[in-house]
Structure formats: C-alpha cells, structure tokens
C-alpha cells in the first residue's frame, strides 16, 4: 500500500502544495468550494514518496493537505540518500 494524500475542504487553491511536490502527485482542477475556484487533488498517490513537502508548504491554519504514511517502499527509502 502506498502513502495516502488527502485534500480537505479548507483548501484555498493557492497551488503551494502543487509546486512543492517533487514527484508531481498533486495537480489543480476546477472547484467551486473556494475563492480561487480550484483545488489540488492527488490523482497519482502511487508516486508519493512521503516527504510531506506539500504539508510544509500549505499556508492554511488547518493543513488542507495531509500525507498519511503507509509502508515504506523502495522509492520512498531512496530519499535518504
């Protein structure tokens, strides 16, 4: 099982998480739930390496993007080098 990336309704559509992701897991799509009219879903969670850069980049008080770590994969363990 890969890492799980969840985007919450508190997303403000700022694109900070999308720009911070080194593996392009996130992308912006149209969404009427915020002023920016866009949200960042995670269509490619299998590429997530669990670095949590998206969480660090999120400017909202309640992090709108959260990474829930699954078992380590060969790919995610490679970040240590």
Swiss-Prot record:
Record text on cofactor binding: Binds 2 [4Fe-4S] clusters. Cluster 2 is most probably the spectroscopically characterized electron acceptor FA and cluster 1 is most probably FB.
Keywords: 4Fe-4S, Chloroplast, Electron transport, Iron, Iron-sulfur, Membrane, Metal-binding, Oxidoreductase, Photosynthesis, Photosystem I, Plastid, Repeat, Thylakoid, Transport
InterPro entries registered for this protein in UniProt: 4Fe4S_Fe-S-bd, 4Fe4S_Fe_S_CS, PSI_iron-sulfur_center, PSI_PsaC
GO biological process: photosynthetic electron transport in photosystem I
Function: Apoprotein for the two 4Fe-4S centers FA and FB of photosystem I (PSI); essential for photochemical activity. FB is the terminal electron acceptor of PSI, donating electrons to ferredoxin. The C-terminus interacts with PsaA/B/D and helps assemble the protein into the PSI complex. Required for binding of PsaD and PsaE to PSI. PSI is a plastocyanin-ferredoxin oxidoreductase, converting photonic excitation into a charge separation, which transfers an electron from the donor P700 chlorophyll pair to the spectroscopically characterized acceptors A0, A1, FX, FA and FB in turn.
Topology in membrane: Peripheral membrane protein
Recorded catalytic activity of this chain's protein: reduced [plastocyanin] + hnu + oxidized [2Fe-2S]-[ferredoxin] = oxidized [plastocyanin] + reduced [2Fe-2S]-[ferredoxin]
EC number(s) per entry: 1.97.1.12
Predominant location category: plastid
Domain of life according to the entry: Eukaryota
Name of the protein in question: Photosystem I iron-sulfur center
Species, as recorded: Ceratophyllum demersum
Class of enzymatic activity (EC top level): oxidoreductase
PANTHER family named in the record: PHOTOSYSTEM I IRON-SULFUR CENTER, PHOTOSYSTEM I IRON-SULFUR CENTER-RELATED
């Amino acid at each position: 099982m890969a890492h799980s990336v969840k985007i919450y309704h508190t997303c403000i559509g700022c694109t900070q998480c999308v720009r911070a992701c080194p593996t392009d897991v996130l992308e912006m799509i149209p969404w009427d739930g915020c002023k920016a009219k866009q949200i960042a879903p995670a269509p490619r969670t299998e590429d997530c390496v669990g670095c949590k850069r998206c969480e660090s980049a999120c400017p909202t008080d309640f992090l709108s993007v959260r990474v829930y770590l699954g078992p380590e994969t060969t790919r995610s363990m490679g970040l240590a080098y």
